[in-house]
Design a protein with these regions (language model features):
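Alpha-helical scaffold segments
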Residues: 1-176
């Protein structure tokens, strides 16, 4: 996780208990899997009601590149082929131009979220930061209502979290 963020268990407690909106307690779970011997690679996952909603890893991003047709080889065989175009594509398509993100981008977004006020986070250009913010207990019902105005501008995966929070706060009466 890095010194700025502390331990994963501490960060998970912060995200799932300390800062999570009361209406979502017990419904959101974060997971981190670290792979020994793979240069510190991790997979971060977000679960809602025990269903994985979002995954953050190099492999998730690379699979996105392949499935979206960004690679010259649409059917890589073997590890070398699979990863051959990853780094150039990662450089060519920064996070704001894709819908899948690496573990490092997850950590950077989490650090940004932790180190700025909630209003900056909810208006962030980074959709991962906005995900953390919309689940935050400091976002009230009036702010949630205002967020509905920008709902269509959100990536599909972020909309799921907006809807989840809005429905949790309103018992499903206002959101579509």
């Amino acid at each position: 996780m890095g010194k700025a963020l502390g331990s994963w268990s501490g960060m998970r407690k912060y995200l799932e208990q300390d800062i999570l909106a009361d209406s979502l307690r017990g419904r959101i779970r974060y997971s981190c899997t670290s792979y020994v011997g793979m240069d510190g690679c991790r997979i971060f996952e977000v679960f809602v009601d025990a269903v994985q909603i979002k995954r953050f890893s190099w492999e998730t991003v690379n699979t996105y590149f392949i499935n979206s047709g960004y690679t010259t080889n649409p059917a890589p065989s073997g590890v070398g082929d699979y990863w051959a175009e990853f780094w150039p594509l990662l450089e060519k398509y920064p996070a704001d131009q894709r819908t899948e993100y690496t573990d490092e981008e997850f950590c950077e977004a989490l650090e940004a979220y932790r180190n700025q006020n909630i209003q900056e986070s909810i208006r962030s250009d980074d959709p991962i930061v906005r995900m953390f913010a919309v689940l935050d207990r400091r976002i009230g019902k009036r702010t949630l209502q205002k967020l509905q105005e920008s709902f269509d501008a959100q990536p599909d995966w972020v909309r799921q979290f907006y809807l989840l929070r809005i429905n949790a706060e309103t018992d499903g009466k206002q959101a579509e």
